């Protein structure tokens, strides 16, 4: 999903497009570029009118590089520099759950409480951590990667997580996989 905001962070327009990640990581990048351009053009603007682009992505983000975003077929992708080059606009990239937690903390909760945890269930299972009023990134920038914690060392392994990880059990993808397995095995 792409959104166009004014300087006071008011949403002016949004545009939704499927990533088509099953076609590969380069296709995902092409679709992000397309979404940004079409959203801007639909508003009668040019990319030169845009001050900056913010991008939230799954996986660990270190200095504009995305690591372990396996559902997008990205590992060690320099997404920030790729998008800057293709869109000719400053680009800022961070983990999607970090940004969501930070947004809730700063905008919805007006900076209170000083400490909080956001947990987000979707294709994966991620989160963000606010400590002393600031986003806490932790070791290797992975403080909110809750989905990678091992819950059941004998559990299922998925294509995008470790065996028995929280994500393999409790993400939308994991829940569907477990339900499908139970139905196929005749469990009630």
Regions found by a protein language model. Give the residues of each.
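Short, glycine/acidic-enriched capping/hinge loops at junctions between secondary-structure elements
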Residues: 2-3, 65
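Glycine/GP-enriched mid-protein hinge/lid loop-to-helix segment characteristic of carbohydrate kinases
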Residues: 3-16, 23-27, 86, 92-94, ...
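Glycine-rich phosphate-binding loop and adjoining helix at the ATP-binding site
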Residues: 21, 25-37, 41, 48-53, ...
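Short helix/loop segment immediately N-terminal to the Walker
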Residues: 44-47, 188
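A secondary-structure boundary/capping signal
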Residues: 56-57, 70, 121, 171
């Amino acid at each position: 999903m792409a959104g166009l905001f004014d300087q006071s962070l008011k949403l002016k327009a949004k545009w939704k497009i499927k990533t088509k990640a099953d076609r590969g990581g380069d296709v995902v990048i092409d679709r992000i570029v397309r979404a940004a351009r079409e959203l801007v053009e639909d508003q009668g603007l040019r990319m030169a009118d845009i001050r900056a682009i913010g991008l939230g992505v799954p996986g660990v983000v270190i200095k504009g590089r995305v690591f372990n975003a396996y559902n997008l077929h990205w590992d060690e992708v320099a997404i920030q520099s790729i998008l800057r080059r293709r869109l000719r606009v400053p680009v800022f990239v961070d983990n999607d759950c970090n940004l969501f937690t930070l947004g809730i903390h700063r905008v919805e909760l007006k900076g209170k409480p000083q400490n909080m945890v956001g947990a987000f269930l979707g294709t994966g299972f991620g989160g963000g951590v606010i400590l002393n009023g600031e986003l806490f990134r932790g070791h290797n920038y992975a403080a909110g990667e809750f989905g990678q914690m091992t819950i059941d060392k004998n559990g299922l392994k998925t294509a995008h997580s470790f065996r028995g990880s929280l994500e393999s059990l409790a993400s939308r993808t994991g829940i569907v996989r477990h339900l499908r397995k139970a139905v196929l095995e005749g469990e009630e």
